[in-house]
Structure formats: C-alpha cells, structure tokens
C-alpha cells in the first residue's frame, strides 16, 4: 500500500546499478548516486551517503546481489565461497546496525538450494528486492501500531532520522507522523539536531517538511527545556540493534533523551522492525559501539569549530537500558512489559499487545 508520497526513495535497484539518495548532500542538494561495485556500496555505507539501519540492510543486500553478477564460475560451491567473501566485506562496513548482517545472511540462505550459478544469481536479486518490499509494509505497520499511542495535537520529540529515507518508505519512528498526516490528526514533532553529523536538522527536518508534517527543530541541549516548556507528550526513536532483554542501541544522545523523559514522566518509545532485534545478544553491554572519525566533531559541514588537534571521543551510538523504555513498537505489536519474555514470544510467532 503506497499513497502519494513526497519524500524520495533512499535506495532503488536498477539491474546494473543501485541508485541511492546521497544523504550527505541534504538538505541543500537532492543528488542521486549510482553504485556499480561492492566498493561503491561499502563506501556509501561507511561515509553515510546511505544510512538508517533498514536502508543500510537493503543497500547491502542489493550490493551483494550486484557483486554476485561479476562472479565468473560455473561451479555452485565455488560461487558460494566467493559470495561469502563479498558478504563478509560488506558486513564489515558498519558494526552496530544488525539489519546489515541480517539482510546479508538472508541473501546467503537464498542460494543454499540453488542447483546452478545462474539460479543462485537470480535468487539473490529476487531476495534483495523482496527485503525492500517487505520493509515498506513493515514500516507502515509500525506506524499503524504507534499511532494508537498518540492523540490529536500531541507534541512528540525525536532524535536522529528514523524516517522514510532511513528505510524503504515511511520510516520507523517517523512512520506514525506520515499516517497521522493522512488522517489529519495534527501531531507536531520536535526534532533534535543530532550532533555531530546533524541527522535531525539535515534529514529529519528536511523530510518532514517535504511530507508537509509540522516539525520544529531544536538543538540537542534544548531537549530538557523543550520537554518542560512545550509540554512534550512522548519521545519516539528508532533503533540500530535491540538486545534480547530490550536494551537498545541507537544514535548517540538517545540515552540522554530517555533519562530526561524519565525525569519528566514522559513515555519513551522505541520503534523498530523485528530485523533490528539481535536475540543472540543478551544485553546492551554486548553490542559493539562504532567510533567514528574525530573530524566529525571538530568541524561542521567542513567548517572547523574546534582546535585541529584536540582529542575527541566520537561514539556513533549509545545504549538505552530497557528499564527506561516505556514500549517497543514493532510490526507485530507493542511490547510494554517484560521485554525478554515478550521478545521471545514475538520470535515464536506469538501475539504481543
């Protein structure tokens, strides 16, 4: 189900290339890039030209299918061996978002029973496209489930960009706002700018304005004052990886928002698809946290804002403990109780709230 949608797609398959919206150029320029090699795909993910856990997974899946076309062998076993090398290479691009390895693993499984190299290559393309199609419906369902938590006129805060351009369509944390717009529910979102790479100001503010959704931009340090003065009703964020107990890795600054929400007695929600859960990881302490280039902190958009040699600590993500999370919204329902128990039920196919 797709409605008229003003926000462009972040990733598209073109048979001989992958077209991505270059998110590094936003909001000043809407530029599309063609990725034709596995190196192009790796670079696009590492340099944040494409970002957002689901979009990274989709891009990597397309990248594996694309690179597989260049594997020259008639031996299926040899084909799978070379495919595994490419998979490991792409999987090393970013360590925190579990959707990346989930999508690549799913493509690997799609060739297990292939009896020829041609069949394997075809299976890879079909599976990658299917991941994107499923993600759009998943995001719509997340939005639909999240919408029941809000009422007309609510003011809701978010951080980073868990929107349409971070997924195949709609987004996770931003999905309810697109659906609310269709139903004229008048939700208003306060977007934290999200230092150091400014995904909130460059991406979330841009895409919500493209979609005609009411948005107000604030700096990260304004969050507490805004919660108090603007009577924020709730906080909703996306996720890059969710542990077995509900601990959640998301963009740096998310943990701080959760602490503030708890202090103001404001519900704090996480919105994520099942593909973001890592049931092999017991708790947040076991999730690897990517550290990025110090220059991201020393400058903004190429303009130096700090001494060139000042030491920098630049983790891209933080971990929000499960006990600060009021609910985890998925395509299968909303979890609000014992996360470890409910996550286990979810993966057994049982219904949650």
Swiss-Prot record:
One example GO MF annotation: S-methyl-5-thioribose-1-phosphate isomerase activity
Domain of life, per lineage: Bacteria
Record-marked site positions (Transition state stabilizer): 160
Catalytic activity: 5-(methylsulfanyl)-alpha-D-ribose 1-phosphate = 5-(methylsulfanyl)-D-ribulose 1-phosphate
Active site: 240
Description of pH dependence: Optimum pH is 8.1.
Keywords: Amino-acid biosynthesis, Isomerase, Methionine biosynthesis
Temperature and activity: Optimum temperature is 35 degrees Celsius.
Keyword Oxidoreductase: no
GO process terms (BP): L-methionine salvage from methylthioadenosine
Pathway connected to this protein: Amino-acid biosynthesis; L-methionine biosynthesis via salvage pathway; L-methionine from S-methyl-5-thio-alpha-D-ribose 1-phosphate: step 1/6
Record: residues binding substrate: 51-53, 94, 199, 250-251
Annotated Pfam families: IF-2B (PF01008)
UniProt-listed Enzyme Commission number(s): 5.3.1.23
Subunit text: Homodimer.
Functional description taken from the UniProt entry: Catalyzes the interconversion of methylthioribose-1-phosphate (MTR-1-P) into methylthioribulose-1-phosphate (MTRu-1-P).
PANTHER family for the chain: METHYLTHIORIBOSE-1-PHOSPHATE ISOMERASE
Family to which the UniProt record says this protein belongs: Belongs to the eIF-2B alpha/beta/delta subunits family. MtnA subfamily.
Record protein name field: Methylthioribose-1-phosphate isomerase
